[in-house]
Amino acid sequence: PLEVIVRNIAAGSFSKRLGVAEGTILAEPTIEFSYKNDALGDPFINDSYAKALGLATEQEIETIKKYAFKVNEVLKSMFLNANLKLIDFKIEFGRFHGDIILADEISPDTCRLWDVNTNEKKHIKKYLEEFLERNNNKE
């Protein structure tokens, strides 16, 4: 499988690698690929590497990008409704009977989220516990 990371705001390894201040809003969402291989530490690769290694064709890479950016639009909107910024997320794609498919989950656990108002980093499990506690106390 090909791991895909979509970033909206600079954070984590992106900030460290490129010297961009954490929290910098990117001019447009970026996409990064990594070769899903635990023994190698899932190294970053580019489109050419993916094609050369037989991980994806040019057309499949375009399909993956289209799907990844569409997922980004949906997740950004969904999390914004919960007062959360979608900083970045990772998903994996692979082939099944010749078709490009999502090969892993899309979940809050694969997303980096910050509070819209405070930029506080949100750990989704803790956030959900707090949310449920607040809503249970309203009854």
Which positions does each model-derived feature cover?
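Acidic/polar, glycine-anchored loop/turn motif associated with catalytic or activation segments
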Residues: 1-88, 94-139
